[in-house]
């Protein structure tokens, strides 16, 4: 729950991390029959992605330009992302998303909008202009044995182990012994 990372720091009277938060929308759609068994991600230009959402028997639909609804940075001043999201007037950008995406895949014109999921997405400010999501790892942040860990991509679960392994000591456990815990 990265959007709450600065909440912990603020409540602990520690300096905030330089994080950017965005209110994001994932549209839930029903695909036309011809596309039902496909996941699609266009990686060039104003890209979009369609992925299965099995719990609702639908697909998520996101678009790099229209998924973000608004953003803020709380390096110097704290903003509670969950409160902002709760009070945010949720108006879907689905129509903009689909109008752009159907230029690439005309069958998407027949996708049916069902609902949207809104959430707070958090990234490091230094990656605001690209899609990089390197691991944020601050060992002994302000006090000994207090660390922050944030990874923005699924494969970060493996990278964080390497990052921790590279430190001489973490949580008082020698590097070699700590790594064996995961073997």
Sequence positions of predicted segments:
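Central helical "cap/lid" subdomain
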Residues: 1-42, 53-58, 170-174
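A structural signal for well-ordered alpha-helical scaffolds and beta->alpha junctions
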Residues: 1-2, 20, 90-98, 157
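Flavin-binding catalytic cores
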Residues: 56, 69-121
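A generic structural signal for beta-strand entry/edge sites
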Residues: 56-60, 144-146
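C-terminal catalytic lobe of FAD-dependent flavoproteins
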Residues: 99, 103-183
């Amino acid at each position: 729950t990265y959007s709450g990372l600065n909440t912990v720091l603020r409540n602990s009277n520690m300096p905030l991390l330089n994080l950017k938060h965005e209110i994001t929308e994932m549209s839930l759609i029903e695909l036309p029959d011809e596309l039902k068994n496909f996941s699609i991600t266009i990686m060039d230009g104003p890209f979009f992605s369609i992925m299965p959402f099995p719990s609702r028997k639908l697909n998520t639909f996101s678009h790099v330009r229209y998924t973000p609804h608004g953003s803020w940075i709380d390096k110097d001043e704290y903003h509670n992302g969950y409160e902002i999201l709760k009070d945010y007037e949720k108006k879907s950008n689905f129509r903009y998303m689909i109008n752009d995406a159907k230029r690439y895949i005309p069958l998407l014109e027949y996708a049916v909008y069902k609902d949207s999921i809104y959430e707070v997405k958090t990234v490091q400010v230094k990656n605001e202009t690209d899609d990089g999501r390197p691991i944020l790892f601050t060992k002994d942040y302000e006090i000994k044995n207090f660390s922050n860990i944030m990874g923005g991509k699924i494969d970060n679960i493996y990278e964080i182990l390497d990052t921790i392994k590279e430190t001489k000591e973490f949580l008082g456990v020698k590097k070699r012994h700590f790594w064996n815990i995961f073997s």
